[in-house]
């Protein structure tokens, strides 16, 4: 295929290919190499047809992939993550964007006010709720763009937003993995050459103090980063390393090689120790009564630098001096921190974005990024902090609590990684044609520092213990839950409280999780549940939604409907209000034989159940069952009953209570938590053609 030699993209591709081939053999003639590359391009180049659709003007045009790519270079539309193109902000006013910016600015203002209050105070909580509502308002616009009933609906906006967010978060994720964990893999030799091209053009002057690296050292390191082993690749990598200068080999070797860069260069490790030495160690106070004595104890503190002359003002000053906010380092270390950051940005960080970074999120092993949420990367820095503490600080705690030293080291790393995140996101923004005056709006801030984190098996499910929030110390170290079912409305308040107690007592408080202690506690709790049910206490039972039967296409399939109707049949003078949230009790009264005991002891109840349930004509207690080519109705019997708050399970029904299923259902919300600790479960209970009482039972078996 004949290639367009005036194409911007084609020329960029050829230029990079020529540079790569010359790295294999610098003695080659550059003009001849370029002609060779052009010839290969003509032989291999593919330019598929594409369709351009403008859903605002209802225009559709045909083109080729290359023509579209070159058009984006010339006209610079905003490029979304799924290939949707938008008119640039400097070409037309976007009222919706302004609306979102105003909402987010309001949120930022509320958060700033929130952090002036004492964490946990009513004022703090109220402002936290308000800023959260602003966030939901902004997010609701995104939801509206995907709803056809919304004024904001656009068939491309929703996917464009979703996939752009994926691109942004995966851009940061791959950078974090590469920079902090040296976890970068090249899927082929072309990607390695592309990365080398970026690295060798990143620093204009390479300093002489960088440690010299041999050809073998660099070659082995680069080859270890290849996704697959290949002798031909190994030979090519060695030839490239041979043709690099001594300075270039050093530059390439230390890129993404953070720990080795620190350990090999005394001037870098000295900067880290100097930062720790020069932090002022001050104590926080609990009340305003302690303020005057603390000022007397520290006459070197200028009271004019305090925001207020009370405990809040003092503690704010202390937290800044202890470097608890990586975005606001104290003056005592600022120069050293900036210097260290420049070295790390120049000689460790690489401004590189893998083309398949979204794919890598799900398919490549991670070493640093523990959890990826909608707009968050949660990083594990424990390994780096431990290494610096042992090998750079050599155990010196500088006469302060070791926890504060960990905060200092974490925030020293975070100061650097924040700069790296800003750089890679600014680069992504420029590639996406964001106007220069808008560069920087896309950013990633350091919001939380977790002391502990437990990650569930399902996506976006985790338990954390928070120490810092945007540089503010929360001395209570609260436990936060995300994604687990037990914090949802279907779990009773008593069970939610019990599970939180288990998590705090056996997972958060101990140095290592006490799995055996948790399982023993659960066994004792099972007996308490049985006793409470028998004595009329229903606080542990799961909650269901009691709604009108007209709200369901198949009401008989809803346990809440069957259970509510059964209660109302037995208690016509005390019916369950609709809608409401009664307690759900599992039963095992599948056949008339199961309720035979009622004939003599509870004859009126027996007659009602025979008529209204086992000879049901409403369809609530029956289900269609296929027999050959025909369908017949089969009775589901009594497999559940709803009990409103403040009422007891009817005495006649008590012998039918399925305690095992009830206990397993009550404890079901804790199973995902136990799975984190390796605790296994197995299915128990009956399944009939008309009902399913199968539940998962917790065992004392642990998977290693």
Q: Where does each model-flagged region fall?
A:
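Conserved acidic
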Residues: 1-704
């Amino acid at each position: 295929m004949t290639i367009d030699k005036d194409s911007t993209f084609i020329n960029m591709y050829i230029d990079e290919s020529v540079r790569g081939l010359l790295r294999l053999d610098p003695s080659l003639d550059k003009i001849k190499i370029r002609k060779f590359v052009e010839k290969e391009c003509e032989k291999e180049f593919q330019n598929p047809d594409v369709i351009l659709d403008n859903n605002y003007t209802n225009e559709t045009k045909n083109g080729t992939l290359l023509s579209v790519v070159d058009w984006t270079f010339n006209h610079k539309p905003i490029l979304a993550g799924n290939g949707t193109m938008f008119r640039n902000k400097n070409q037309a006013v976007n009222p919706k964007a302004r609306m979102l910016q105003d909402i987010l600015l309001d949120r930022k203002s509320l958060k700033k006010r929130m952090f002036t209050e004492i964490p946990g105070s009513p004022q703090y909580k109220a402002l936290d709720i308000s800023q959260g509502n602003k966030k939901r308002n902004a997010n609701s616009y995104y939801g509206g763009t995907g709803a056809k009933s919304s004024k904001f609906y656009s068939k491309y906006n929703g996917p464009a937003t979703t996939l752009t967010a994926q691109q942004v978060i995966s851009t940061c994720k791959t950078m974090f993995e590469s920079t902090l964990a040296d976890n970068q893999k090249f899927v082929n030799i072309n990607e390695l050459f592309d990365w080398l091209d970026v690295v060798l053009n990143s620093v204009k002057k390479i300093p002489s103090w960088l440690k010299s690296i041999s050809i073998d050292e660099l070659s082995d390191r680069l080859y270890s980063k290849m996704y697959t082993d290949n002798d031909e690749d190994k030979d090519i990598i060695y030839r490239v390393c041979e043709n690099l200068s001594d300075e270039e080999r050093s530059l390439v070797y230390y890129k993404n090689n953070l720990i080795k860069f620190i350990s090999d260069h005394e001037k870098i490790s000295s900067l880290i120790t100097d930062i720790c030495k020069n932090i002022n160690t001050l104590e926080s106070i609990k009340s305003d009564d302690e303020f005057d004595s603390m000022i007397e104890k520290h006459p070197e503190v200028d009271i004019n630098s305090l925001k207020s002359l009370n405990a809040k003002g003092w503690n704010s000053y202390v937290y800044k001096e202890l470097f608890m906010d990586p975005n606001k380092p104290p003056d005592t270390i600022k120069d050293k921190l900036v210097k260290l950051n420049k070295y790390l940005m120049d000689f460790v960080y690489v401004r590189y974005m893998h083309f398949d970074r979204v794919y890598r999120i799900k398919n490549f092993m991670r070493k640093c990024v523990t959890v990826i949420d909608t707009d968050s990367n949660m990083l594990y820095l424990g390994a780096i902090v431990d290494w610096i503490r042992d090998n750079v600080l050599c155990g010196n705690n500088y006469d302060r609590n070791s926890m504060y030293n960990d905060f200092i080291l974490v925030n020293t790393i975070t100061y650097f990684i924040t700069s790296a995140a800003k750089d890679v996101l600014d680069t992504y923004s420029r590639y996406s044609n964001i106007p220069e005056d808008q560069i920087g709006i896309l950013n990633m801030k350091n919001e939380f520092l977790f002391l502990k984190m437990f990650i569930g098996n399902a996506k976006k499910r985790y338990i954390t213990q928070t120490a810092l929030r945007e540089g503010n110390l929360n001395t209570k170290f609260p436990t936060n839950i995300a994604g687990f079912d037990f914090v949802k409305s279907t779990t009773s308040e008593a069970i939610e409280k019990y599970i939180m107690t288990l998590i705090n007592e056996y997972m958060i408080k101990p140095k290592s999780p006490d799995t055996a202690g948790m399982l023993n506690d659960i066994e004792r709790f099972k007996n308490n549940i049985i006793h409470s049910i028998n004595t009329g206490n229903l606080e542990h039972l799961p909650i269901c939604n009691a709604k009108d039967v007209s709200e369901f296409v198949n009401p008989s399939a809803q346990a809440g409907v069957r259970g509510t109707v059964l209660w109302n049949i037995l208690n016509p003078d005390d019916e369950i209000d609709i809608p409401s949230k009664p307690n759900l009790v599992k039963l095992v009264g599948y056949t008339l034989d199961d309720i035979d005991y009622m004939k003599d002891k509870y004859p009126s109840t027996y007659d009602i159940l025979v008529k209204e349930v086992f000879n049901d004509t409403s369809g609530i207690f029956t289900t269609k069952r296929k027999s050959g080519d025909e369908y017949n109705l089969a009775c589901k019997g009594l497999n559940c009953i709803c009990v409103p708050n403040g009422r007891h399970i009817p005495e006649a029904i008590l012998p039918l209570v399925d305690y095992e299923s009830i206990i397993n259902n009550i404890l079901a919300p804790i199973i995902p938590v136990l799975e984190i600790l390796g605790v296994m479960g197995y299915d128990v209970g009956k399944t009939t053609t008309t009902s399913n009482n199968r539940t998962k039972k917790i065992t004392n078996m642990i998977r290693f």
